[in-house]
């Protein structure tokens, strides 16, 4: 009597799944309900074994990257060699969302991505979790105004398990003299399914034109003192303590540096990297990249990774390949990525698609992980906000309405 593939023993199905290439996992999940369920509930140890096996079998110098262009996320293989090249693996699709969405902002966190619709998505497992915000708000677009929601995903360790949280904040200021400003920091807990207002009075400005960088469960941003000056610091949000740390200095000076730009990245989920780009006295582009030698809650030290004179411009985001000692990031022509390295090494690779003007572009190295997104259990009784939190929320909403009225006058 023939055995249907959906009725195979679990251990045999797990063995089969462990041999499926990552790019074919989505097709396997769509085969039948049993395969889809098993691919999601499969043990973390097996998932770790599979990911480790895939990593070992990668070609030398190969990196898997995700790019955000024209509201789409695409998975690409980049091989850095004497003659580097790219292989397009396809568009990343949230096939378990009711409708496909345009992606305008991405925060990368150890294999999870989050968009401004507040969908947390793990491409490896094919899991998503939609998070309901407490209010909907559109940006005020006025003279000398700067505004954007900022999001970051992190965790604290509870009983050897990761308890995930989502930070969302507004730091809304009208003109840089600080005459009118509004800020509101709140955090969402995946376990309780509740939002909580945080007691934060920032003495800094976070560079909101860039996404934060996740490292070991916490998030880092480029920042500057609220009193003014350059964006010559980083700041960390600790998801365990639910608070910001002190401003930590970057390893370079902005004095006599024209048209400067600072971009933050991470290295192998172990260190931070920062790219400093500026024009020298001869108006030639200079790129410096530094990596953290030591990073603690209240101190940081840096080591220089790379310096390139008259190098090409890198926009928005970047990542590095430590082994090959190169940096990879978007060109300003909106359709190619630059690879820069020592001794004037430079290669330009065409992505095959031109990015639309004024749309966000993002590139980052992608490493699958066994972390799964905790779902809200069906039939759970919804917890209610405390009366104190309700009053804080109502007060902040009144402050926001009053602030926007003042700015629009």
Curated annotation (Swiss-Prot):
Transmembrane segments: none annotated. Residues 2-49 form the F-box domain. The keyword Magnesium does not apply. SUPFAM superfamilies: F-box domain, Galactose oxidase, central domain. The keyword Repeat applies. Gene3D superfamilies: 1.20.1280.50. Kelch repeats lie at residues 169-218, 221-266. Keywords: Kelch repeat, Repeat. It holds the Pfam family FBA_1. PANTHER family: F-BOX ASSOCIATED UBIQUITINATION EFFECTOR FAMILY PROTEIN, OS09G0372900 PROTEIN-RELATED. This is F-box/kelch-repeat protein At1g48625. It comes from Arabidopsis thaliana (Mouse-ear cress).
């Amino acid at each position: 009597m023939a055995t249907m593939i959906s009725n195979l023993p679990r251990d045999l199905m797990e063995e089969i799944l462990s041999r499926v290439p990552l790019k074919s996992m989505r097709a396997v999940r769509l085969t039948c309900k049993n395969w889809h369920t098993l691919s999601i509930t499969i043990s973390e140890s097996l998932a770790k074994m599979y990911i480790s096996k895939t990593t070992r079998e990668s070609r030398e110098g190969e990196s898997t990257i995700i790019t955000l262009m024209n509201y789409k996320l695409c998975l690409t293989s980049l091989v850095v060699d004497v003659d580097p090249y790219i292989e397009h693996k396809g568009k990343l699709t949230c096939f378990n969302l009711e409708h496909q969405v345009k992606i305008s902002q991405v925060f990368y966190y150890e294999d999870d991505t989050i968009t401004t619709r507040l969908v947390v998505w793990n491409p490896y497992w094919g899991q998503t979790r939609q998070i309901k915000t407490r209010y909907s708000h559109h940006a005020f677009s006025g003279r000398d105004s700067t505004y954007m929601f900022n999001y970051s995903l992190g965790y604290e360790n509870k009983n050897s398990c990761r308890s995930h949280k989502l930070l969302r904040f507004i730091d809304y200021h009208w003109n840089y003299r600080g005459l009118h400003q509004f800020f509101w920091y709140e955090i969402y807990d995946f376990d309780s399914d509740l939002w909580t207002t945080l007691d934060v009075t920032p003495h800094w400005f976070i560079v909101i034109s860039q996404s934060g960088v996740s490292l070991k469960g916490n998030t880092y941003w480029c920042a500057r003192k609220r009193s003014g000056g350059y964006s010559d610091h980083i700041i960390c949000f600790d998801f365990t303590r639910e608070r910001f740390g002190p401003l930590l200095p970057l390893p370079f000076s902005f004095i006599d540096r024209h048209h400067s730009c600072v971009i933050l990245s991470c290295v192998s989920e172990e260190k931070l990297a920062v790219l400093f780009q500026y024009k020298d006295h001869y108006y030639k582009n200079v790129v410096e990249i530094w990596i953290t030698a030591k990073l603690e809650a209240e101190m940081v030290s840096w080591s220089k990774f790379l310096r390139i004179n008259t190098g090409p411009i890198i926009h928005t985001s970047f990542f590095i390949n430590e082994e090959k000692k190169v940096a990879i990031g978007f060109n300003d022509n909106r359709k190619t990525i630059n690879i820069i390295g020592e001794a004037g090494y430079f290669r330009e690779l065409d992505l095959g698609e031109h990015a639309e003007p004024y749309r966000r572009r993002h590139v980052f190295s992608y490493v699958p992980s066994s972390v799964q997104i905790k779902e809200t259990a069906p039939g759970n009784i919804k917890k209610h906000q405390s009366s104190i939190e309700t009053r804080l929320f109502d007060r902040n909403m009144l402050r926001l309405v009053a602030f926007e009225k003042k700015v629009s006058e």
